[in-house]
Amino acid sequence: MGITVLKNEGLDFHARISTPLSEIDDDIQKELLDLTKKVKIAGFRAGKVPVSIVKKKYGTSVRNDIIERRINHSVNHVIKEHNLNIIGRPKIEELQNESDKALEFTVKIELLPKITIPDLKKISLDRPKLEVNSKDVEEQLEKLAALTKNYTKESKAKIKDGDQVTIDAIGYIKEKAFEDGKLNDFKVIIGSNALIPGFEKQLIGSKTGSEVDVNVTFPENYHAKDLAGKDARFVVQIKAVHTAEPTVIDDEFAKKFQSNSLEELRTHFTKQIENESEEAINTIMKMNLFDKLEKLLDFDVPESLLEQEKNILKSGTDKNEQDESLLKDKSSKEITAYYNKLALRRVRIGLLLAEYAKSKNLQLEPDDLRKVIMQQARNFPGQENMIFDFYKNNPRAIEGLKGPALEDKAVQYIFNHEIKLKEKKYTKEELEKYLEAEEQRITLV
């Protein structure tokens, strides 16, 4: 076998490989001889089929199989001989297998970069810490009580905040009724903001049996694009008004929610608030860590990974409102530059974390995958069981989660063992403002 290196620069390795035809012919002959002992052909006893007959029937397929095996063997030999750290499948080009002298082809191999892990102990980050107070917990109890109110008492008085109103409504845009603009026996709690902004407020002061003209403007980000930003008028019939019976928040109330006492329910809400904030804090800290890492990384990345990441980003833009808003009114050149920069950042950080996980011998445990699946499920409120069933019945989908799961494990290991974390305490209100500001600041990743 002859090997001529054509290119060995950066992350590209190209070589021309040739194998004497005599070696190919020898392999073909051996394969055909083996087949004479195995194949069954009418008119011949088992194991007594002449080679010429076998060659006539199977010669082409045997030759193709031998050539494919030779190519794979040769490529693996080159990879081992040159100690190549490859990514993806090698590309075979300029294949010549009809020559009377040799099998020849060019192999193009993309390499992984050599990654030097930076000194992570020099990195420092703030670690927000939420201090849950009694006011936060009482707010959650009040919200729960509001959701479980009994609207049994019919009212003839004027509508006020907190009342449950049953309405019929027809919506008009430029005096023409529009599709999906009709409501029948629709129940709405005044002040719940369940309807278009401004709708509920205009019902206040009316009574059962009255007709109200409600004028609103659909939000620019309204889910029905054909209605977004448009002015509309609704003719509303007030069919019934009910007031809520007062809800007493006590031990009996708590028992309705699988708690033995009100104190136990308070403890549950304290932990829930802490857990919800912890997930948001971890996301922001991860992004802030990536911002720091981005400035430390300058290695080249495989072109195939870069293109793959750009395609993922582009295909997800229409589902990402923040991304879509950021690119609005940008030129094609600016959009391309944005995707190039973001894709490069993601690939570099992904490769670094994979190398870091390898250096620390981090292994995925079942709990690591469960956490990632739980995160996925939380993105689909009310459909959690469907998400769990999907991953339970799709092993290939589970495989797709292993990369993100290992990345998360590496990030948590870095937080716990490498970088300096400075704890900073926040109230719930302060933390919400901080997280909102950070979400606006950080680079999308």
UniProtKB/Swiss-Prot annotation:
EC nos: 5.2.1.8
Keyword annotations from UniProtKB, A to Z: Cell cycle, Cell division, Chaperone, Cytoplasm, Isomerase, Rotamase
InterPro entries per UniProt: PPIase_dom_sf, PPIase_FKBP_dom, Trig_fac, Trigger_fac_C, Trigger_fac_C_sf, Trigger_fac_ribosome-bd_bac, Trigger_fac_ribosome-bd_sf, Trigger_fact/SurA_dom_sf
Domain PPIase FKBP-type: 162-247
Subcellular location: Cytoplasm
Keyword NADP in record: no
Record remark on domains: Consists of 3 domains; the N-terminus binds the ribosome, the middle domain has PPIase activity, while the C-terminus has intrinsic chaperone activity on its own.
Protein name per UniProt: Trigger factor
